[in-house]
Amino acid sequence: QLRIVLENLLNNARRFSNDASKPIEVSITRREDQAVLSVRDYGVGIATEEQDMIFEPFYQIDKSRFRDSNHYGLGLNLCRTIIEAHDGNLRVESEEGSGSTFFLEIPMNLQSKD
């Protein structure tokens, strides 16, 4: 399940990046009893008023050149659902025009909840 989340975050970072010369940055750190994985892109960014809405089902940022009939606005909602099922948190920090960083925070004592 965590692989699904990471793949989705990386695919979104690649899709919304507008400068191929700037790499997508991925890091993992430990904070107390949590693992924190971050995915940073240098793409279009997300307006402050949309940052909570992007985790809602079917919500898509209206950036016309990124609209695609193969994307339905479910990926981030699915990611957040998976992470919260493991007592974690998925959040974003972003500035429009400067890219986004998604933070996946999960407990280090993660137990499988199959």
What are these regions (language model features)?
Residues S21-D33:
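Short beta-strand/loop element within the Bergerat-fold HATPase_c
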